[in-house]
Design a protein with these regions (language model features):
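Eukaryotic intrinsically disordered, low-complexity regulatory linkers and tails enriched in Ser/Thr/Pro
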Residues: 1-112
């Protein structure tokens, strides 16, 4: 069985733990984009959420990972404009989205 990791969520951000150690951590303010996609061709393929950070790093969160739901709950309260779960999960599973997945959040750069 593949280790899906564990997502730990706090008020300021989140971390991904795999194999008993922290492999990635970020503040909510450093999240640039969230993209949901399937790893594979079939509808039963694992669903992943690619979290792109401001520095270009992409952290992959597995839907089956403990803490994934807590991540989405906190993200919906913290990231303005995040698409509701129902708007992207069912179309992705049904195969009606593009092969590149669905962007569920994108931070708009502020212009001064």
């Amino acid at each position: 069985m593949t280790d899906t990791g564990r997502v730990v969520v706090v008020a300021a951000g989140f971390a991904l733990w795999t194999g008993g150690r922290c492999v990635a951590a970020s503040r909510w303010a450093d999240v640039r984009r969230l993209r949901a996609y399937l790893r594979g061709e079939s509808a039963d393929s694992p669903l992943l959420l690619g979290v792109e950070l401001l520095d270009g790093t992409i952290v992959e969160l597995h839907e089956a990972a403990p803490g994934f739901d807590a991540f989405l709950d906190r993200a919906s309260a913290t990231l303005p404009g995040l698409l509701p779960f129902a708007a992207w999960h069912a179309p992705l599973r049904a195969g009606t989205s593009s092969t590149e997945g669905i962007v569920v959040f994108e931070r708009v750069a502020r212009r001064y």
